[in-house]
Amino acid sequence: MSNNPADRVQDLQNFGEFGGVNPSIADSSTFTYLKASTMQAVFEGEQEGCHLYSRHTNPSTSYLCQALARMENTEAAYVASSGMGAITSCILQICESGDEIIASRTIYGGTYAFLKNFLPKLGIKTHFVDITKTNQIEALVNGNTKMVYCETMSNPLLEIADIPALASITKNTSIKLVVDNTFTPMIISPIELGADIVIHSLTKFINGASDAVGGVVCA
């Protein structure tokens, strides 16, 4: 597969239902099952590849997930209703009470507020650091550390994270390096630099027109 994100997305062939050059838009909230046994298998997690309810997936969001996974060169992607929806679901999937996060002090305000004001209620502690000083991060790593969180280029201060240096700290540990790549899609590929998970607010650079809200987790 090409190392160029644009080429990887361009090579994704997904046409409309009747051969349209663009994928069809799915505007249904629920989907038909011709056999009750199929629905039961989907509910019980025994069968994949079927759409159940558009809050989870539908053909349109599945195509978007494929394109974003191609762009970030990850195995899969999952879209959310907003950037913060993607960020919070990712963090809460990895961390639980008693865990600790090391995060950049210059991250997006909504993310900072979630880490600082909401996670302590769940017993999750965040250490905010100068992400450019890896010695600070190494000093804070302990047995409770579950995540190092940063932005490739911070919003809005444009501080640059050294992802390979951060990956050298988390490599061969259970700590996940989570990178918000909102400001630099198609320019930087965090996965190829050592990140474990990549997040985007689709509302910003990828949308580009300020007329839609969305988020994605790529891993």
Where are these regions (language model features)?
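A broad "ordered helical/assembly scaffold" signature
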Residues: 22-25, 31-36, 50, 58-61, ...
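Generic structural signal for well-ordered, non-membrane alpha-helical segments
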Residues: 3, 20, 57-61, 108, ...
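N-terminal "arm"/small-domain region of PLP-dependent enzymes with the aminotransferase-like
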Residues: 1-58, 66
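A generic structural signal for short, solvent-exposed coil/turn residues
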Residues: 2, 19, 45, 71, ...
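Conserved PLP-enzyme active-site core in the AAT-like
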Residues: 9-14, 76-219
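Short, hydrophobic/aliphatic alpha-helical segments
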Residues: 3-7, 66-70, 194-200
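Conserved N-terminal alpha-helix of the aminotransferase class I/II PLP-enzyme fold
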Residues: 35-85, 110-117
